[in-house]
């Protein structure tokens, strides 16, 4: 199960604050009717940062590297990691993990965890398939460096690689389906 996305309208019902991590864990335990969670994921980095796999802007002239858009202040990693460590000590979770993190976020979390003698995350979950292989550049090496496992999501590319796009005869996806079908045998 994961924590980050809004679970209500309150300010403490979203993100990676210690309060939300604890509350979301309790809610998940209740919904799952269990006494512990094997792997509890931080679903995104807190603070609205877009990872390289999240929002990609190919229109580079529109990107202002010197004045990034305003983002809410992220919860400090120390607070996030302490909250997960307490849940581990309480037996409510066995392991923490990350999802949709950039390689430099993995490095931040692992270095902070190591400096405080916390277990830290044990795996990263990222989109990975034959058509989306960007994680091979930095994320997989970071996971290797810090000893994290890798759990791919969308291994069939949302149906792209499983033949689901064959049925589209017109529209936006029809051209993509044609290319996939043409190259399927390769």
Protein language model features and the residues they cover:
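Short, acidic/polar
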Residues: 14-32, 77, 82, 106-110
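Acidic/hydrophobic-patterned starts of short beta strands in beta-sheet-rich repeat architectures
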Residues: 39-40, 97
């Amino acid at each position: 199960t994961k924590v980050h996305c809004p679970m209500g309208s309150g300010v403490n019902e979203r993100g990676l604050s210690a309060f939300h991590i604890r509350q979301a864990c309790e809610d998940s335990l209740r919904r799952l009717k269990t006494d512990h969670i094997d792997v509890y994921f931080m679903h995104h980095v807190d603070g609205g940062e877009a990872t390289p796999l999240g929002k990609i802007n190919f229109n580079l002239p529109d990107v202002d590297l010197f004045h990034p858009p305003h983002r809410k202040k992220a919860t400090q990693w120390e607070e996030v990691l302490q909250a997960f460590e307490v849940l581990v000590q309480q037996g409510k979770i066995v392991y923490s993990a990350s999802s949709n993190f950039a390689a430099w976020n993995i490095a931040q979390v692992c270095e902070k965890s190591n400096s405080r003698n916390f277990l830290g995350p044990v795996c990263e979950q990222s989109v990975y398939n034959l058509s989306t292989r960007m994680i091979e550049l930095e994320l997989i090496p970071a996971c290797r460096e810090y000893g994290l496992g890798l759990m791919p999501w969308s291994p069939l590319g949302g149906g792209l690689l499983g033949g689901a796009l064959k049925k589209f005869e017109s529209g936006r996806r029809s051209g993509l389906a044609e290319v996939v079908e043409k190259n399927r045998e390769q």
